[in-house]
């Protein structure tokens, strides 16, 4: 979707007969805020930034996004130390408003939480989406902006041109071999989920 904003020829090659039938169909829809990844990693950077952008994407594309917030419960001092580590990770990663809360606030936010919980990491920026709705909205927007969608086209092979993957001219560097036809391209983004290897 983002690349469709530029003067490029783009093709989304999908193995299945429609979008979101791979790893996306098993996604629970929780938009993680970014307190889990180790600070400084690419995952930390894209996780926190992605969570931040979901509100904008929802407005632009018309899918439902709700900032539900999340709690990670702790039941003893060891858990509290782990929650503090997650809080520090999150703050380093740019996650806003993380805090450690006590039993009273836990039950104010979630009355059915375990009565044994002594503390929790509260993260108000965590959100929830329907992963199918997001994938469909993003692809529809991309197609409306000139992206080609090739379905039922599992990639059987990727051939690299003699110039190699770093060829200097404008000729295609890669050929994706699929039963639906071959796709020649200069750049290849592998977003195949579990089939990406």
Language-model segment annotations:
Residues 121-187, 191-195:
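Helical element adjacent to the flavin cofactor pocket in flavoenzyme catalytic cores
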Residues 4-26:
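Glycine-rich FAD pyrophosphate-binding loop
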Residues 29-109, 118:
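Dinucleotide-binding Rossmann-like beta1-alpha1 core, especially the glycine-rich loop
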Residues 14, 67, 101-103, 151-153, ...:
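Short loop/edge segments at beta-strand edges and connector loops
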Residues 16-18, 106, 138:
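Short beta-to-alpha linker loops that shape the active-site pocket of alpha/beta-hydrolase fold enzymes
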Residues 8-10, 97-98, 188:
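Hydrophobic anchor at the start of a short beta-strand
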Residues 1-5, 31, 56, 61-66, ...:
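Active-site substrate-recognition segment that forms the wall
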């Amino acid at each position: 979707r983002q690349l469709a904003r530029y003067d490029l020829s783009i093709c989304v090659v999908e193995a299945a007969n429609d979008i979101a039938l791979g790893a996306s169909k098993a996604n629970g829809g929780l938009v993680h805020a970014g307190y889990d990844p180790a600070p400084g990693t690419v995952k930390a950077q894209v996780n926190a930034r992605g969570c931040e952008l979901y509100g904008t994407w929802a407005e632009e594309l018309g899918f439902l996004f709700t900032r539900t917030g999340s709690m990670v419960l702790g039941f003893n001092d060891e858990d509290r130390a782990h929650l503090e580590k997650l809080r520090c990770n999150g703050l380093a990663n740019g996650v806003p408003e993380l805090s450690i809360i006590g039993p009273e606030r836990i039950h104010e936010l979630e009355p059915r939480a375990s009565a044994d919980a002594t503390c929790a990491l509260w993260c108000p920026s965590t959100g929830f989406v329907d992963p199918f709705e997001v994938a469909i909205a993003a692809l529809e927007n991309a197609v409306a902006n000139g992206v080609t969608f090739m379905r039922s086209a599992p990639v059987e092979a990727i051939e690299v041109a003699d110039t190699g993957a770093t060829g200097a001219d404008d000729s295609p560097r890669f050929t994706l071999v699929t039963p639906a036809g071959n796709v020649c391209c200069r750049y290849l983004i592998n977003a195949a989920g579990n089939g990406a290897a």
